[in-house]
């Protein structure tokens, strides 16, 4: 993988997320969901190496076969993939897609509720706008499904995230209330009153109150709003009811921590609340406790480029973090893409980890592992491990056809399918590029005259 001057490349990409060959027009492909792609390099997304000269067969919007020596039925329309690569649609497990239109405009930002009376009870699926410009930008870059999470504002619990597909004119929320997000570490300490001790006490008390509420009304989860809370309860009825799926194991608990000691504290939660389905978000020092994370079978959403200490809780940060955790047996997905349309950088970050594997003394990922970190592993974390994120038979046909190696910085998406249906690559950025690529003199008066 050709990777040099990574920091400079990241800056250059900020304004040119979509290559000039893409996003000029909707994809030209069979709309029926029944087709085949042949003579293409196939990347399944399960960690295996890419397969050259392969094919993919799709029927009814689902994968029938993918790989080498695949029999293509004669009656199917065929897309010639000569010189191209095909991968599963990219999956980003932690974003604010659909919650923010313009980051600098407060009125268009629903990711942060600074004065809300609720915390765990917040449900972002009710505010997601699939027509928000960052959604189209991310789709044109190969993102087909994403987790959408709120940002913790005035309590350690941020609220309930959703899983969406990015199909044009598609449903806003595929899976509402897909996970709960809680802040610990330095941010959680600040929200809890100034210390990690307070944050841990608040978290454990909240989980106990939710467990007690569930025991008083068996079989109820977020519908338990009609139940009263004890007079000494710290949580509102709505927040306690929203945590019942967490303590009963029906909803994953995403916990944002960075420091090794804080990660150990998260793993200890499982001893008191054995039904918890934990996911660690951040884990900047995860490599220091990688064996413990692997033994607990807790997946991680981590940044690929966190190689410098940005705070006291990331003093041991290293760009080898993801590679070391993966080598220890931890399932690691690349995630945490906030700031509007930044999920588009996922292939670049994954490619950086491939390049890192060639740096003496560093630990990166193989090509197959890197692709899995932005496809099948985040899909599994979001609960779609048997549905999307791979080109295995039976999976939905979320596919991206690329004009080269998708982990190369200069490669762009050519055709994108979600559920086997071709998607438009047109977005606000591509329209601006087309408008000003070849500017023409207009007969209208200048605005400054």
Predicted regions and their residues:
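Boundary at the C-terminal end of the N-terminal hydrophobic targeting segment
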Residues: 19-27
């Amino acid at each position: 993988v050709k990777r040099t001057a990574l920091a400079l490349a990241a800056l250059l990409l900020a304004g040119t997320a979509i290559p000039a060959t893409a996003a000029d027009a909707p994809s030209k492909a069979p709309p029926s969901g029944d087709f085949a792609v042949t003579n293409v390099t196939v990347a399944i997304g399960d960690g295996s190496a890419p397969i050259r000269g392969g094919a993919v067969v799709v029927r009814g919007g689902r994968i029938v076969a993918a790989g080498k020596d695949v029999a293509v039925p004669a009656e199917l329309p065929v897309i010639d993939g000569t010189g191209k690569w095909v991968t599963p649609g990219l999956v980003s497990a932690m974003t604010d897609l659909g919650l923010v239109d313009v980051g600098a405009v407060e009125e268009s930002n629903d990711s942060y509720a600074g004065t809300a009376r609720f915390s765990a009870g917040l449900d972002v699926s009710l505010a997601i706008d699939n027509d928000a410009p960052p959604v189209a930008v991310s789709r044109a870059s190969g993102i087909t499904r994403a987790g959408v999470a709120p940002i913790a504002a005035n309590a350690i619990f941020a609220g309930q995230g959703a899983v969406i597909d990015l199909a044009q004119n598609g449903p806003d929320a595929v899976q509402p209330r897909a996970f709960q997000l809680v802040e610990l570490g330095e941010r959680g300490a600040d929200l809890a009153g100034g210390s990690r001790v307070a944050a841990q006490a608040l978290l454990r008390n909240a989980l106990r109150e939710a467990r007690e509420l569930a025991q008083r009304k068996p079989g109820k989860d977020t519908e338990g709003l009609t139940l009263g809370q004890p007079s000494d309860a710290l949580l509102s009825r709505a927040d306690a009811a929203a945590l019942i799926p967490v303590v009963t194991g029906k909803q994953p608990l995403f916990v944002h921590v960075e420091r090794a000691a804080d990660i150990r504290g998260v793993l200890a939660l499982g001893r008191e609340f054995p039904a918890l389905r934990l996911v660690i978000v951040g884990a900047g020092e995860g490599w220091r406790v990688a064996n413990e994370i692997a033994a607990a079978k807790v997946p991680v959403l981590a940044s690929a480029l966190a190689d410098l200490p940005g705070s006291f809780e990331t003093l041991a940060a290293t760009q080898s973090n993801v590679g070391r955790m993966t080598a220890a047996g931890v399932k690691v997905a690349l995630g945490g893409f906030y700031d509007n349309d930044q999920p588009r950088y996922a292939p670049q970050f994954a490619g950086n980890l491939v390049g890192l594997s060639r740096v003496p003394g560093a630990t990166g990922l193989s090509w197959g592992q890197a692709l899995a970190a932005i496809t099948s592993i985040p899909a599994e974390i979001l609960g779609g491990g048997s549905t999307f994120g791979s080109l295995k038979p039976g999976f939905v046909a979320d596919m991206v056809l690329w004009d080269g190696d998708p982990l190369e910085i200069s490669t762009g998406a050519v055709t994108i399918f979600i559920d086997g249906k071709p998607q438009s690559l047109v977005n606000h950025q591509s329209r601006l590029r087309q408008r000003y690529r070849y500017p023409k003199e207009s007969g209208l008066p200048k605005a400054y005259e």
